[in-house]
Structure formats: structure tokens, C-alpha cells
Amino acid sequence: MKKFISRYGKMTLVALFGLCIFLFWYCGYPQALCYQEQNQLFLWSADYFWHDLSVAGGLADYISEFLVQFYYIPVLGAAILAFLFLAFLSLTYQVIRSYTAKPLKWYGMLMALLPSILLLEVMGDIEVLLSFPIALTLALLSTWLMNLATRRWGARIAWADVLLTPVLFWLIGGGATWLYVFLRLAFFLMQVKKGKLPSVAIAYPLSILYLWAIQLICYSTLLVQYPLMSVMTGINYYRVPMQYPGQKWGYDKDLYALLKLNEQVRNGKWEDIIHDAQESQVQVFYTSNCVNLALAQTRQLADRMFSFYQSGENALLAPRSRDNMSMYPTMEAFWRLGLVNSSLRYASDLQASILNGKMSGRLMKRITECQIVNGKYAVARKNIDL
């Protein structure tokens, strides 16, 4: 048994972890995939690529937006996240191993699991963007490769850090680059202590001041429109400006119920909406809108409307509000009632309410449909060509 654990323990642990991540996103939390996908619009164009790359962290943001578009199919979204978490876990293990230069026991993989579990907790926040784990993964990859290069070529490789640090800052953002710098600093200090690097390498802590200076220069010249804290910790990691991943803790049952309703309305799961409302219904106007829309679509509204919670005069059609969620069921209701211009107005307002200024594939589709119905074919064709 001990021989089996020693030989296959790490492989089994990694496989189980990947399976758990896949099942979590596919079976337990698919509504988050829908929410992420509907709040962005990836464009296959060189202009879009260079637009993303014009901001610090742009490469991580571009890769994340490319991957998130596949969340439209939940099984693909769950598979992408499982692969990303496995890459993060494997690189965490390799970075830990690079500090010791010795193979780790199977419990070394357990140690490497802790950052992955913390990352999963952070990703539970619906406003955390995929660019955050991608940036961290790229930072770990850079750390691992540079640690291996330092073992081979010694302190001379430190000059590569002088060039790599600003490049990483611009490609993956401030927070992930700080992770890279501190991990490299720990590696250099350990090697100096073991006598494997000359004592001059003790000057590597100056890299902290170096990165700070790079960020201040970029803040004062290229990124003047962003707050200093966002430049230092990451611009594209969190959808809400001036807030950062990891600030929210706990399980918000009502929020996840609303996210599930949003996914069900989008995919026309009317019977599921009614069934869930019979079990439990959050008492806000959003749920009244969704349930009443489901009842109308299944021709039960007149008979069963008052069997469910009704929020008041806004239970059927909600007024406009300044957020990127509340108006979706009303937009859908207007579309099905044939009130095309009202649906168009709500879709446009929803798109303008996305907090990080992105467009939405779901909303652009509805806007295009409304333009076609209104006979504005040139505008609709322009949207389709996006």
C-alpha cells in the first residue's frame, strides 16, 4: 500500500482534484459561467488584441476573454477551468520543488493544493475575472523557469530579471508580478544562505523598489486614468473598479439563486423556474419578474400568478435600474410581448451598466434582433460583422 501511494499518490491526487473542479463548475455552479460569459464580447481582430495590450495586464485579460467566450457551453467552461486549476496546481508544485531541487513526497502535492483551494474560494466571487488566475499561473510559470535558469547559470541570470520584470508587469498586471518578485526574492535569499550564490546576490531585494518604480512611472505616464492602487495590484482582475478579489467571504444563498434564475431565463428553462420557485423564492422583484415570465411562457400566468411571491406593481415589468442584472427578465418579457423598442432600450441600458466597460455578446445579439425587426438592416449587419 505504501509503495502504491508513493508511486501513484500524486497522480491520483491531481486527477481527483481536476475532477472535483470540473464537477464544481459544471454541476454546482454553472450559473457563474453564464454570468461571466454574458458580461463580455470577445472580438477576433487585431485591433481588439492591441486594445487589450495597451493596458497593464492586457495579455492575461485577452487570454481570459478568449476562453470565457466558450463558457456559453457549460461543459466547455467547466473543462477550461479544470485545466487551468490543474496547471496552477502543477506549477505551484514545480515552484516548491525548485526551492529544494529534490523530488517531493506525495504530501508535497497536498501542500501545493492549499493555494489552489484559496484560489477556488476567490473565484467564487462572481466579479473576479478569469484574468486573475491566468495572471497568477503565468507568474508561477515564469518563476519556475527562472529558478531553473538560476540554478544552471548562477547570479548572472539576475540581469534577465531586470528585463523580465517590466515585461511581466505589462503582460500580466501588478498583483501577479508582485508574486513573481517575492518568489524570486525568496529563492535568491535561500540560495545565498546555502552558499550556492555569491553574497552580492543579497542585493536582489532591490527588485521590490525596481518594480515599484516601474509602476509609478507607468502610472504617471501611460496609465494616468487608473487609480494608483489599481495599477499596483491589477487593473483587470476584478470587474468592479477599486475593489479587489478576496474581500468577500461566505456563501450568499440569495445571490446564487438569482444567478441561477438568470441562467434559466436565458436558456428558456421555464418549467425549472416554476419548480424552483415552489421550493424557495427570494423575495425581490427580480424573482417575481422571472417567475411571472415563466408562467406566461407556459400559459399559467392567469391561474397561478398569485401562488408565488409578487413584489408589487413591478412584479410583471420592472422599471429601469443601474445594474447589469435586474433588467434581463423585463427585457425578455418586452421582446416576447412584441414591444421591440422597449426591449432594445433595456438591452442598451444593460450593456452600458457593465461595470468594467465591456460589451456583451448576449445583449449584442438581442440588440441586433431588435434592429432587424425595426428594418435597420445596415446597423444589424454591422453588429453581426463584429
Segments from the language model and where they lie:
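Soluble catalytic regions of membrane-associated enzymes that act on cell-envelope
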Residues: 244-386
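Loop-to-helix entry region of an early transmembrane alpha helix in multi-pass inner-membrane enzymes
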Residues: 71-86
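Transmembrane alpha-helical segments
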Residues: 84, 88-96, 138-150, 186-191
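Membrane-interface helix-boundary motifs at transmembrane edges
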Residues: 3-4, 93-106, 149-157, 190-201
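Transmembrane helices and adjacent periplasmic/lumenal helix-loop junctions
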Residues: 126-130, 148-194, 208-219
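Start-transfer (signal-anchor) and selected internal transmembrane alpha helices
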Residues: 1-21
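Membrane-interfacial interhelical loops
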Residues: 30-70, 117-130, 212-242
